Structures are given as structure tokens and as C-alpha cells.
């Protein structure tokens, strides 16, 4: 998600300005989960990777830009689509229990399952997928969908965010979820300068008190924002409230930053002692997976601390890592399973050399002593 939104120069500035306390790694590799997504055919690469519970012992994975085909068969045997899904039976990293899905055309060619279809959709719009959650009141899964548009069809870097929608998948639906609904939302900032642009949907926390906390990112500083709404009012945007630094405000424009230097995808999870852990990639794109600890879902949050230093960029100067987040649904007691994405600034050249590059990596963080 937004993986190409920064040129190499901005990545360098991000690395130089990152503010996490750089200490030794406090996480460990989760090798079995990383190996789960190392595949030769069918789905063999994607970023994004969010998880939502979808019934008893069933987890929905969903991804943004996805590679489909034969990873060893050359470019003619590969297709990129803008999003895809997978269903895992159970909570263990078993290849036999994980099935990937995407839509298909009349001749069987892979197609994107979630395509913008709302009233304000323009030709050429596509979705990258944000955070999501299962809403037991509505008996549906909700996924934030960023509506993107390339200003120049010949330039992959010319994309812009034109709006944020909600994808609604009723419980019991069968992938690739052709029966889903789409709802336009007012939850994106459409300013004229980079510091005025942003959106909600980077992360979601469903609290026991009935509120759904939705995190947003704004500006070049990657400022963290938060909104909340009760589960029964998710589709009524007049009921959404935005934290302004002192109270919950009706005006989204009054949203106050909780922190800066986070990533376009992240997670907020409760800790056993009543605090909350925010997991993100320092500065959006960097080798550092970081955390902040907060006293409530809206903060205040403590300083950024390093969880893990990714090594992929040391292997190749074109590789970069981004958008770390936790997956509590798949985490063992007393720990958090965390993913991060790996990509290349020279994507199509590098994917030919290393077809296993473009897939999530996983680490495991022990919660004791945080």
C-alpha cells in the first residue's frame, strides 16, 4: 500500500530522520509464517497483508498489489492485479490450510476482485486496501479501500489518492466476494499540498466498549490521527468523532496528531496490563519496525522504540521494507505476530531475479517486559 509513494530521495531523508531508539532487536524471526507465503505458482507475491476473523477458526487475509502466475516462467506467465484475498483454516501456518483467491475473466485470466464501483468512480480508478475488521452487529467485514488513480497511464509513480471507500462483505460470503457492497466515505483529506493530504483506514482497533477506533495518516510527517464510532453506526458518518487533542470532535479537520513518523499501515493492540501497543514501520519506509506504548487507544503514546531491524535492504540497494503491523488474531498467548512488506525500487527487474522478494516477512514479539 502506497509502496511507491516516495522516491529514493525521500526514503533517504526518512532514514536519516527516523526517531526510534535504536537498540538491539527485541523480536525474533517467525520463520514458519514467512515460509507460508513463499510460493512458486498461483499467488506468489503481494503487499498489504491485513487479517480479519471470518467465522469459527477461519481467518481472512487480504493484500494490495498482487503477483499471479508462475514465478519461474518469465514475464509472459505473470500478471499483477491490484488486490487479492486468502482464507486460512485455523490459526497455524499450514500451507495445506491456506487458499488464495482472485477474480477471473471470461477466458480465465486473473482479475482484481475489488474494483471501484461507486457513483464517483472514474475510468482507471483502482483500490489499494487498508485496515479492516469484522462487525458482529452488522454481521459483516468492513475493509477500508483507498481509491487510487494514475494521472499518467505510462508512469507508475503518477498515482494519487482520490477518496476512501468502505468494502462491506456479509458473513458467510464466498471468496472472491462478488456480493460485497461499496460505500463512499468522507474520510480522506483532499488538500492541494502533500501536508494536507491523508486518509483514515491505516489501522483499526475494535474495543470491548463497543467503539471502533480507526487510525489515519496525514502529511509528509506521517502524523497519526484517530477517529472512533460505535459498531452499529459505522455507515452513518455523522456519528463519527475525531480526537482533537482534548476531546472527541465532529469535525475531521480538527483531528490532532498523536505521533509522527508512523507508516501508512499499522496496528493498535491491547496489552495484558491495560496499556496499548502501536506497531509500525519507522517513517513509513525504513529498515526499522518500531512500537510506541500508549495509555489509551488515543494516547498519549511514549517514544518510538525499535522492535526489529530488517536486513533486506542490505542485500540489494533497491530493496526496501515498509508497513509493519501486528496480527493479534494469529498470535500465541504472550506475544504478537508482526508482518512487514518487502519491495524494490526496480520492481519488475528485481522480481525476475528474485521471484520470492515480494511477499511478507514475519517476526514474533514477546510482550513480557515491554
Residue spans of the language-model regions?
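Bacterial N-terminal signal peptides that target proteins for export
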Residues: 1-10
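Hydrophobic core register within WD40 beta-propeller blades
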Residues: 51, 132, 204, 266-268, ...
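Short, linear, compositionally biased motifs with a strong N-terminal bias
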Residues: 14-15
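Beta-rich catalytic cores
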Residues: 45-47, 127-129, 198-200, 262-264, ...
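Cleavable N-terminal signal peptides
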Residues: 10-11, 21
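Beta-rich carbohydrate-recognition and catalytic domains
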Residues: 24-44, 53-125, 134-193, 208-263, ...
Amino acid at each position: 500500500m502506497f509502496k511507491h509513494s516516495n522516491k529514493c530521495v525521500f526514503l533517504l531523508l526518512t532514514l536519516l530522520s527516523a526517531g526510534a531508539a535504536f537498540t538491539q532487536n527485541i523480536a525474533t524471526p517467525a520463520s514458519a509464517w514467512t515460509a507460508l507465503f513463499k510460493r512458486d505458482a498461483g499467488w506468489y507475491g503481494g503487499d498489504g497483508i491485513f487479517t480479519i476473523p471470518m467465522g469459527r477458526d477461519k481467518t481472512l487475509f487480504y493484500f494490495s498489489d498482487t503477483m499471479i502466475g508462475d514465478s519461474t516462467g518469465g514475464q509472459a506467465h505473470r500478471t499483477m492485479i491490484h488486490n487479492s484475498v486468502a482464507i486460512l483454516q485455523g490459526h497455524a501456518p499450514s500451507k495445506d490450510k491456506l487458499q488464495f483467491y482472485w477474480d477471473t475473466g471470461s477466458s480465465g485470466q486473473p482479475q482484481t476482485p475489488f474494483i471501484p464501483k461507486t457513483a464517483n468512480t472514474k475510468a482507471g480508478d483502482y483500490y489499494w486496501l487498508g485496515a479492516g475488521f469484522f462487525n458482529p452487529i452488522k454481521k459483516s467485514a468492513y475493509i477500508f479501500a483507498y481509491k487510487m488513480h494514475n494521472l499518467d497511464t505510462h508512469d507508475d509513480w503518477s498515482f494519487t489518492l482520490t477518496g476512501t471507500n468502505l468494502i462491506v462483505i456479509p458473513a458467510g460470503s464466498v471468496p472472491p466476494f462478488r456480493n460485497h457492497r461499496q460505500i463512499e466515505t468522507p474520510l480522506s483529506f483532499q488538500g492541494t499540498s502533500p501536508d494536507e493530504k491523508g486518509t483514515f483506514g491505516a489501522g483499526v482497533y475494535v474495543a470491548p466498549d463497543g467503539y471502533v477506533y480507526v487510525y489515519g495518516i496525514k502529511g509528509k510527517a506521517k502524523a497519526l490521527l484517530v477517529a472512533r464510532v460505535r459498531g452499529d453506526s459505522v455507515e452513518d458518518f455523522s456519528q463519527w468523532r475525531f480526537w482533537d487533542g482534548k476531546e472527541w470532535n465532529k469535525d475531521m479537520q480538527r483531528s490532532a496528531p498523536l505521533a509522527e513518523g508512523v507508516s501508512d499501515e499499522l496496528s493498535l493492540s491491547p496489552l495484558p496490563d491495560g496499556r496499548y501497543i502501536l506497531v509500525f514501520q519507522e517513517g513509513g519506509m525504513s529498515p526499522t519496525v518500531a512500537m510506541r506504548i500508549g495509555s489509551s487507544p488515543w494516547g498519549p503514546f511514549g517514544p518510538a522504540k525499535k522492535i526489529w531491524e530488517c536486513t533486506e535492504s542490505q542485500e540489494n540497494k533497491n530493496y526496501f521494507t515498509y508497513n509493519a503491523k501486528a496480527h493479534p488474531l494469529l498470535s500465541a498467548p504472550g506475544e504478537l505476530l508482526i508482518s512487514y512488506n518487502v519491495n524494490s525500487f526496480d520492481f519488475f527487474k528485481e522480481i525476475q531475479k528474485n521471484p520470492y522478494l515480494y511477499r511478507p516477512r514475519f517476526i514474533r514479539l514477546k510482550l513480557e517486559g515491554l
